Amino acid sequence: MAKKITGYIKLQVPAGKANPSPPIGPALGQRGLNIMEFCKAFNARTQGLEPGLPIPVVITAFADKSFTFIMKTPPATILIKKAAKITKGSPKPHTDKVGSITRAQVEEIAKTKMADLTAADMEAAVRTIAGSARSMGITVEGL
């Protein structure tokens, strides 16, 4: 018989830097989950990723105080800002442009994000990422 699910916890945790301090500790503690067990497992799984890159994670809490977690790909905005070498998007995205990225960079981001996107094919994923970039005030060259 399957375990009874008591809830889901959604967090964004920096890769390789999970520790019991907020927001992780309180979120897991109020459900009675083992905080250190999660931190060790998460840090082990994110070992190969760039340290500090925020990773969305969905933790499924069970009635017997056990848990499982699913890691998603980093947010598209983080990857776009990194590719454009900027710290934040434009406050007026359609009038003030803050940077530019090439189609090749957009395709690389789309490849990374493909698992989490609802796009049917690679071209649709590229258009989705390009739209996100444009809404941040970043021009997409070659598209």
UniProtKB/Swiss-Prot annotation:
InterPro entries: Ribosomal_uL11, Ribosomal_uL11_bac-typ, Ribosomal_uL11_C, Ribosomal_uL11_C_sf, Ribosomal_uL11_CS, Ribosomal_uL11_N, Ribosomal_uL11_N_sf
Keyword Acyltransferase applies: no
Record-stated family: Belongs to the universal ribosomal protein uL11 family.
GO BP terms in the entry: translation
UniProt entry tagged with the keyword Metal-binding: no
Post-translational events: One or more lysine residues are methylated.
Family annotation (Pfam families): Ribosomal_L11, Ribosomal_L11_N
Keywords: Methylation, Ribonucleoprotein, Ribosomal protein, RNA-binding, rRNA-binding
Protein's name in the database: Large ribosomal subunit protein uL11
Domain of life: Bacteria
Organism field: Aromatoleum aromaticum (strain DSM 19018 / LMG 30748 / EbN1)
Subunit composition and interactions: Part of the ribosomal stalk of the 50S ribosomal subunit. Interacts with L10 and the large rRNA to form the base of the stalk. L10 forms an elongated spine to which L12 dimers bind in a sequential fashion forming a multimeric L10(L12)X complex.
Function comment: Forms part of the ribosomal stalk which helps the ribosome interact with GTP-bound translation factors.
UniProt lineage: Bacteria, Pseudomonadati, Pseudomonadota, Betaproteobacteria, Rhodocyclales
A cellular component annotation (GO) from this entry: cytosolic large ribosomal subunit
Example GO molecular function: structural constituent of ribosome
CDD domains: Ribosomal_L11
